[in-house]
Amino acid sequence: YGIRPLCFGTQKQDDGTLDYLVSSESVTMPALEFDLVRDIAPGEAVFISCDREMFCEQCAENPQLTPCAFEYVYFARPDSVIDGISVYGARLRLGEYLADEVAKQLDLSEIDCVMPIPDSARPAAQQLAQKLGITYREGFIKNRYVGRTFIMPGQQTRKKSVRQKLNAMPVEFEGK
């Protein structure tokens, strides 16, 4: 019902027929040589017949777009576009907004550096550091073989997974 993104694209075949691709992220389209057609609207159903005919129908009364904020902050790849908004651009704007708030509430001379938790926080942290004129540093290395820690069941499982997923680089923390 308009919480999670969904889009579709087409690819014209040599015989003139169209293949369709439905995906939660637009980034899959160019990677598979499909042309992004559009986002699927909240409450909309997309039907593709065996004859490769596609039609769409609104199935919900009063559908509303109520996107999950975590799509832009955490879930989506930075090179995706959701509802016409670049995920990377949204993360940069979050960094700008955070910089404005930090400048209002904190003494900037007390901040040693800006350091993201990889990977999704990186664009916002870079923008924050740039806007405030503060050094940007990488202090954590991510173990790519551990799944998404935010969505794991239970706090104990999340804590254990975070310990396995992130390794601090001691050189960035010594004397701090």
Predicted segments — roles?
Residues 1-176:
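PRPP-associated nucleotide enzymes
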